[in-house]
Amino acid sequence: MSVQVEREGVVLALSHRSGEGRPLLIVPGVMADAASWQGVVDALCTTRPVYVLNRRGRRPSGPLGDGYSVRTEIEDLCRVLDALGTAEDGGALDLFGWSYGGLIALEAAGRHAGIHSLTLYEPVVRPFGLQALDALRRADEAGDLDRAVEIVNRDVSGFSAEYVAQLRRSPAWQALRPLAAPLAQELTALNDHPADLTGYGDLPMPVTLLLGGDNEGVPPYGEPLARIAAAMPRARVRVMPGQGHLAHVQDPGTLARYIVEALDWARQQGAHACPR
């Protein structure tokens, strides 16, 4: 089932698994869409409604548009939260964000009152992937999606040439190509965004930070999470042994269990709301 929300003429589409109780909204990062997260949705042992946002640049949502920035994404997410809060009888939602989607969710949590809890899986903040930006922009200008997929895996995520070669031979490569189209603009927006780490510690809702054990203390994903965790002393950090940055693809069942555990913990903390 799908749901559509509109903001300033741009359609924002979400997948929707129906249920009862407090809704969960999932915000994917770059190189991912709602379909990429379906394995996690299917594995979630909960009866609650689950929504997954197809951010701008992912069909059937609209394009990034002129003047695209992280603020664009934040305002999109706040509009979606407004719409889902109305659809779900005005109750607060539990919000989950991964990677770039984690940054967007984190920023929205400081601006929207309808968030009951926040769970972030390896959110990223600037500086991030700067060494790959020029190459990504050249690939974007050339319309070379294959090259963009290669760059993000090799030069941003740090995967081996062998891994990328295997990925290129797999059916997943064709699904990744269109997801690479907005990548240069998204990475530019991320590095242009002055995230206020000191302000994150003031968020009143329960916060869980999820970290793949393989990334603990190392770039490119462990370091941003460590910085965010240091700025949020009340947040709970959960390390997932044997996982990296792609548990939603490589081990969706395990990631789903950690998400449900975070939601259960948040419920035990009691209801909280973020001031507007």
Predicted regions and their residues:
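Conserved HGGG/HGGXW glycine-rich cap/lid loop of the alpha/beta-hydrolase fold
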Residues: E6-D66, I259
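Active-site loop/oxyanion-hole signature of alpha/beta-hydrolase fold enzymes
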Residues: G39-D42, Y51-F96, R257
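Active-site loop/turn elements of alpha/beta-hydrolase fold enzymes
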Residues: R55-G57, P123, G242
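Conserved hydrolase catalytic core segment
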Residues: G91-P127
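Helix-rich cap/lid subdomain of alpha/beta-hydrolase
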Residues: P123-A172, L179-A180, A184-N191
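Conserved serine/cysteine hydrolase catalytic core
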Residues: Q174-A231, R236-V239
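Catalytic histidine-centered segment of alpha/beta-hydrolase-like enzymes
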Residues: M240-G253
